């Protein structure tokens, strides 16, 4: 099935679901409240079914991915705008594949958790917005899934830009129309920041096309030909900045982060999961795929600056998180700190750092997603986002408290959980080149223990707050939503090899393109490489003991 259009079908399935949802009767259809509830339930079930079909199809695609095969697999290239060399070109390497898998796992989870979000059931007291269309909410969610799959799969820079910008539209409406509090302000701020970054990237994309026409060659936006352009060091530096600023805003990396706390706090929990769990990863993915691959000289030149910004972001996000009193805002600032750790691993320019950073993208998506969902479940019961309005929850809702604890411990990278593997690799990879940065990043991890444990202590332990005395524990739908994320955090923490094996060859290719070949990651498809990898792990364990 090597010629089967896996990626196209994966992206089209959610669009088909969106069309089916749009064809269902709306609120203006005749009938009473019971009929409206039945129609809303049908919409939710359609969205869930199509998201699960997308997940199953993506798993089948991953099974057919050949480790040790060509760098980009499941490729498909068709002319789109031939006059300007624009193609519909898609394909995935190991990095893109694991991020697509993370995306299609999170979407059905979010649908289950967001079952009543469109009606405002999870809003704090006094913050319920006007009742909005359930059809529109879940249609936007499925459209967003298509955009997210497309942005990771694109192998044409112009196509990537289209998906990169198109993602803003459904998320803008999900925040502005279905959010809480200052939702419109947060949505506009999110949109303006993103559009500013996108404008800079568009200028760089056009410049790339112009340089591709040098020597009378036909211009192209295809990724692979552009990666082999002979660009001067000066040109690479300027084009790097155009792409990097757009990705730093999307990630977000300090000091481009200020839109995130507002957007994540105003968004419904499900939308916040996709915002922090997936859309942020588009920024860090872009740094690996485009900044380093297309502009290696520019990447090397700006590496010290990016390392410095990453360390500042790690410490700043952690320190500000400690002072937060709003539950969702605290989790948002933890992401600012964690994204700094991811960019640190990327620009350490080592195999361990980039493998760890990519694995951290996946781990962070699951761990922070679980935190946001459970926080949303708490807010829907207590009708408050203030940490001080909780207390003693573990006595009345032990399952909720237990899962919240696991998600929180993942946030501080407890050994045995997937985030520990990620942070360990990032720190090891960084320490081999930037010892001071690695030490300062470790301080950020220590601070993470403070804000996570403080949050848990204030909300879950101590005397039972009278306002939460009747709080019900998680019910079946909520367990089905958050349970898979907790399971993945544990499973990938105990056995990360399948994911790391997918990532390793792609990281190797990226480092080769960046003219960094020492150390070279062992190739998982090579027996000698596997032995070397095992020997390295054993040696590291012995050294640590």
PLM feature segments, named:
Residues 1-2, 149-155, 288-302, 342-362, ...:
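Helix-coil boundary and interhelical linker segments in multi-pass alpha-helical membrane proteins
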Residues 28, 37-43, 136-143, 147-235, ...:
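Alpha-helical multi-pass transmembrane bundles of energy-transducing inner-membrane proteins
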Residues 254, 368-372, 438-470:
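Predominantly late transmembrane helices and immediately cytosolic-facing juxtamembrane segments
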């Amino acid at each position: 099935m090597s010629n089967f259009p896996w990626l196209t079908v994966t992206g089209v399935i959610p669009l088909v679901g969106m069309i089916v949802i749009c064809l269902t009767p709306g609120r203006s259809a005749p009938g009473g409240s019971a009929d409206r509830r039945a129609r809303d339930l049908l919409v939710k079930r359609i969205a869930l079914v199509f998201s699960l079909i997308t997940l199953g199809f993506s798993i089948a695609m991953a099974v057919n991915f050949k480790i040790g095969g060509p760098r980009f697999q499941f490729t498909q290239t068709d002319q789109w705008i031939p006059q300007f060399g624009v193609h519909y070109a898609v394909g995935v390497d190991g990095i893109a594949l694991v991020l697509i898998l993370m995306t299609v796992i999170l979407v059905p989870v979010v649908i289950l958790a967001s079952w009543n979000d469109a009606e405002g059931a999870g809003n704090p007291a006094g913050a319920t917005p006007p009742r909005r269309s359930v059809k529109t909410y879940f249609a936007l969610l499925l459209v967003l899934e298509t955009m997210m799959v497309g942005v990771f799969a694109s192998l044409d820079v112009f196509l990537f830009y289209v998906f990169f910008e198109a993602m803003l539209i459904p998320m803008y409406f999900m925040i502005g129309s279905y959010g809480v509090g200052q939702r419109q302000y947060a949505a506009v701020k999110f949109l303006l920041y993103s559009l500013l970054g996108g404008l800079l990237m568009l200028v760089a994309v056009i410049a790339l096309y112009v340089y591709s026409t040098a020597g009378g060659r036909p211009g192209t936006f295809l990724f692979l030909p552009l990666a082999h352009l002979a660009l001067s060091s000066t040109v690479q530096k300027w084009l790097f900045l155009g792409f990097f600023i757009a990705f730093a805003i999307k990630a977000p990396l300090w000091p481009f982060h200020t839109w995130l706390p507002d957007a994540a706090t105003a968004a419904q929990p499900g939308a916040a999961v996709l915002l922090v769990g997936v859309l942020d990863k588009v920024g860090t993915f872009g740094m690996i795929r485009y900044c380093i691959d297309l502009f290696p000289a520019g990447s090397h030149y700006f590496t010290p600056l990016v390392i410095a910004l990453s360390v500042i972001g790690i410490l700043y996000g952690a320190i500000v998180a400690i002072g937060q009193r709003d539950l969702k805002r605290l989790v948002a600032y933890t992401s600012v700190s964690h994204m700094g750790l991811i960019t640190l691993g990327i620009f350490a320019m080592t195999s361990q750092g980039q493998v760890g950073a990519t694995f951290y993208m996946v781990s962070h998506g699951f761990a922070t997603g679980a935190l946001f969902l459970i926080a949303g479940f708490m807010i829907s019961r207590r009708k408050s986002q203030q940490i001080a309005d909780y207390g003693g929850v573990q006595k009345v809702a032990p399952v909720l408290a237990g899962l919240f604890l696991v998600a929180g411990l993942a946030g501080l990278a407890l050994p045995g959980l997937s985030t520990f593997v990620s942070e360990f690799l990032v720190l090891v990879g960084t320490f081999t080149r930037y010892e001071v940065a690695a030490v300062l990043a470790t301080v950020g991890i220590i601070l993470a223990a403070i804000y996570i444990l403080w949050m848990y202590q204030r909300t879950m332990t101590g005397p039972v707050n009278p306002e939460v005395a009747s709080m019900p524990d998680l019910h079946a739908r909520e367990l089905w939503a958050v349970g898979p994320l907790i399971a993945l955090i544990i499973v990938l923490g105990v056995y990360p090899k399948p994911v790391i094996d997918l990532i390793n060859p792609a990281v190797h290719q990226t480092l080769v393109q960046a003219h960094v070949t020492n150390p070279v990651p062992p190739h998982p498809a090579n027996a000698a490489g596997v032995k070397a990898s095992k020997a390295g792990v054993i040696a590291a364990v012995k050294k640590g003991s």
